[in-house]
């Protein structure tokens, strides 16, 4: 309705590929000159381009406060046994790929498993993802842990204490928890199907793996 109007419009895109089959019929095929499209990253831009390839989209990445400079209560991670902690945060759904992370952990050599710990944080939106995590925590109770919810202070404390963030998403425009980890100077291992993959400098502040492949994730 605003296309071609006198009102300047900034249209900010942060949707995943998964949403476009449901909304594509509502997206105009041509935009007035008053409309400017921006996206949270290349993944979000590619998602729009999957249905409107002719749209000109510019990057506009969100900002977050410097949480690392704030004061927050301490979250007790002693259950991780003092080992390097690899954490992932987000709702349990196919798009978020918790099952991929679970499979990657199972592929690790026993000697590597003994030296590391893993934490899954999030609500169970899809039973299949929750089942994968529950099965893994049952098989590896000393190394793999699940927490349904953390407060904002607890999330900040987790970011301050963990070793690395892992995002195994199949379709994720710009996962906030990875950005929060980067604020705390923590490296991230992310899927190529995340907006964050376009920001990572390989081997410097993280690693990117391809093809939603648990073996490639395990190698990282």
Regions found by a protein language model. Give the residues of each.
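Aromatic "clamp/platform" in nucleotide-sugar-dependent glycosyltransferases that forms part
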Residues: 170
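Short alpha-helical segment that forms part of, or immediately flanks, the ligand-binding pocket
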Residues: 156, 175-183, 197-198
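Short alpha-helical donor nucleotide-sugar binding micro-motif in glycosyltransferases
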Residues: 149, 157-162
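Conserved donor-binding/catalytic core segment of Leloir-type glycosyltransferases
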Residues: 78-96, 102-105, 119
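Short hydrophobic beta-strand element within catalytic cores of glycosyltransferases
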Residues: 187-190
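A short, active-site helix/loop in glycosyltransferases that binds the activated sugar's phosphate group
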Residues: 21, 33-59, 64-68
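Conserved acidic donor-binding segment of nucleotide-sugar-dependent glycosyltransferases
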Residues: 202-203, 207-213
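Short, structured helix-loop element that forms part of the nucleotide-activated donor/catalytic region
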Residues: 44, 119-142, 154
